[in-house]
From Swiss-Prot:
The gene is pyrD. GO terms for biological process: 'de novo' pyrimidine nucleobase biosynthetic process; 'de novo' UMP biosynthetic process. NCBIfam families: PRK05286.1-1, PRK05286.1-2, PRK05286.1-4, PRK05286.2-5, pyrD_sub2. Monomer. Catalyzes the conversion of dihydroorotate to orotate with quinone as electron acceptor. One of its GO terms (cellular component) is plasma membrane. It catalyses: (S)-dihydroorotate + a quinone = orotate + a quinol. It is found in: Cell membrane. This is Dihydroorotate dehydrogenase (quinone). Binds 1 FMN per subunit. CDD domains: DHOD_2_like. Pathway: Pyrimidine metabolism; UMP biosynthesis via de novo pathway; orotate from (S)-dihydroorotate (quinone route): step 1/1.
Length: 340
C-alpha cells in the first residue's frame, strides 16, 4: 500500500509531498484510522531516561515540526515521537526550493532552516493531542538571534515546553542555521549546558518533575571533538545524547542529481558516519548517558546495528519517507532478534 502511495507522492515536489503526507497522517490520526491501516510492531518496551517507551524505535525531529500529526504518527507504531525543531518565534525558514530527494541513494538533502510556526503554536497542538506516550520536543534558536544570544532562545523554549514534554532535545547541530554548530564546542557548549542545567533545576522545583534533557549533535566531528562533547554532557548533568543530525559531507552522492545542493544530507549515505559517532560516544560515556541513534536507518538491520554500537533507542526520518511504516516494524523486529 505504501509503495503505491509513495509512487504518487514522489510525483509531487518534495515539500508539497511532505506537507500532503503530514496532512494525511494527521487526518488519519484524528479519525483513528492509522492503527487499523498499518500492521503494528511487536511489543518491545524499554526504559530509558526514567521514561517507559512502548518500543525503542521513534520518529526523529524534523518531520513534524509543529506537532500537526502527533496522534497520527503514534498510531503508525512508533515507540516515541519527537516534534520540532521549534523556535521562540515563528519563522519561514530558507527560500524554496530547500528539500531534495536523491532516490538513487535513498537520501534527502534539506536546507529548511527551522521553518516553524513558533513554540506557542506547537504547544497548542500538543494540548489538542490525545497521545499519552513519550513525546520529545526539539528546541532551537531563531535565525535572526545572534549566536552569542542563542542561550536566551533555548531558555525561552525550555520554559515554555517544560511541562508539555516527556523529554526535551536541544538542537545545536542543524547545518542550516548559520553559526549554530559552533555551539557544540568549547566555552560555547559549556555556557549553554550550564544555563540549561541551572534553568532545568529551577523548573523541576517549580513543577515537581525533572524533565530529561538530550543534546543532538552532528556527525561531522572528529573522535577527539566527540570525546570532548561527551565529557561536557556528563559534567553538566545532561540526560542523553542524540547522534546524529544530518551531514555536510557528500560522499557517494556528488554525481547524483541534486547531490551538490547545499544543506544537510540524510538517509543511507550518513549511516556509517553516524554509527561511528555512536560507537565513539559509547566508549566515552561508559553507560553513564544513554545514546539515541539517528542517521541512515533505511532497513531494520540498521537499527540493530545502532543498538549493537551502544545506542539505547533509535529514530528514523528519511528511511520512513522511502520505506513507510513497514520500516518501524522491521526495526523493532531486528532489535528484538538481537542476542541478549
Amino acid at each position: 500500500m505504501y509503495t503505491l502511495a509513495r509512487q504518487l507522492l514522489f510525483k509531487l515536489s518534495p515539500e508539497t509531498s511532505h506537507d500532503l503526507s503530514l496532512d494525511l497522517i494527521g487526518a488519519g490520526g484524528r479519525l483513528g484510522l492509522n492503527g487499523m491501516l498499518c500492521k503494528q510492531p511487536a511489543s518491545l518496551p524499554v526504559s530509558v531516561m526514567g521514561l517507559n517507551f512502548a518500543n525503542p524505535v521513534g520518529l526523529a525531529a524534523g518531520l513534524d515540526k509543529n506537532g500537526a500529526a502527533i496522534d497520527g504518527f503514534a498510531q503508525l507504531g512508533f515507540g516515541f515521537v519527537e516534534i520540532g525543531t521549534v523556535t521562540p518565534r515563528p519563522q519561514p525558514g530558507n527560500p524554496k526550493p530547500r528539500l531534495f530527494r536523491l532516490p538513487e541513494a535513498t537520501a534527502i538533502i534539506n536546507r529548511m532552516g527551522f521553518n516553524n510556526l513558533g513554540v506557542d503554536h506547537l504547544l497548542g497542538r500538543v494540548r489538542a493531542s490525545r497521545y499519552k506516550g513519550v513525546l520529545g520536543i526539539n528546541i532551537g534558536k531563531n535565525f535572526d538571534t545572534p549566536v552569542e544570544r542563542a542561550v536566551d532562545d533555548y531558555l525561552i523554549c525550555l520554559d515554555k515546553v517544560y511541562t508539555a514534554a516527556s523529554y526535551i532535545t536541544v538542537n545545536v547541530s542543524s547545518p542550516n542555521t548559520p553559526g549554530l554548530r559552533s555551539l557544540q564546542f568549547g566555552d560555547s557548549l559549556k555556557q549553554l549546558l550550564d544555563a540549561l542545567a541551572e534553568r532545568r533545576e529551577q523548573l523541576a522545583g517549580a513543577h515537581g518533575k525533572r524533565v530529561p534533557l538530550a543534546i543532538k549533535i552532528a556527525p561531522d566531528m572528529s573522535d577527539e571533538e566527540t570525546a570532548l562533547v561527551a565529557a561536557a554532557l556528563m559534567e553538566s548533568g545532561m540526560d542523553a545524547v542524540i547522534a546524529t543530525n544530518t551531514t555536510l559531507g557528500r560522499e557517494g552522492v556528488e554525481a547524483l542529481p541534486y547531490g551538490g545542493e547545499a544543506g544537510g544530507l540524510s538517509g543511507a549515505p550518513v549511516l556509517e558516519k553516524s554509527t561511528h559517532i555512536v560507537k565513539v560516544l559509547a566508549g566515552e560515556l561508559g553507560g553513564k548517558l544513554p545514546i539515541i541513534a539517528a542517521g541512515g536507518i533505511t532497513e531494520g538491520r540498521h537499527a540493530a546495528e545502532k543498538i549493537a554500537a551502544g545506542a539505547s533507542l533509535v529514530q528514523i526520518y528519511s528511511g520512513f519517507i522511502y520505506k513507510g511504516p513497514a520500516l518501524i516494524r522491521e526495526a523493532v523486529d531486528a532489535i528484538a532478534a538481537m542476542p541478549r
